[in-house]
Amino acid sequence: MSLKRFYIFTGKGGVGKTALSLAFCSHLTENKQNCLYIYFQNNKIQAKNTNTADKQLEQMAMDLGFKTLGLDLMACSQEYIANKLKSENIAKWIIKTPFFQSLVNMIPGLSYVIYMGKILEMLVKDPTLTAVLDSPSSGHALTMLESTQNFNSIFKDGIIHEDTNLMLKELQTQDFFKLNIIALPTLLALHE
């Protein structure tokens, strides 16, 4: 089996995606691969113990010997805008505007294109890196892939078209990407 550079583990809730993602990262690390476990951060505003589950994941990964990255939409957006405009200050200002925050929430799939861009950018910058995304559900993973294609089709010119073109080209590279759909052995799971 040849190793890929980018793996997504997805499926219904409660089927063991996180356990399998962590186990796969542990396997890669034991085989001397530079592995990064990626998850969507819990961005909900909580009481004192914010993001307890995220901290537990990070601690578990650290105990197993690999790095983690919690994807935060506003941080990824700010980084993307700063790279395009060559200005951290302007990017900080833009993402704090109510207009930008509404725009991200209003346009279906935009957040997933931003996340996909962040992951692929890291993989291009570091050719030794293997990324393992623990996707919360199959809908999220599918939206991430479809949105990249949809935005590429909608914008026939400009920065977004160029960036999504690069993303699609990278995803279609042979032996680059693998989608792992985790399901319970039931008829319902097979039909879905």
Where are these regions (language model features)?
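Charged, low-complexity, helix-prone segments enriched in Lys/Glu/Asp/Gln
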Residues: 28, 76-80, 84, 96, ...
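Short hydrophobic/aromatic beta-strand immediately N-terminal to the Walker A/P-loop
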Residues: 7-8
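Conserved catalytic-core segment of NTP-binding enzymes
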Residues: 15, 19-24, 30-31, 36, ...
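Phosphate-binding P-loop
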Residues: 1-4
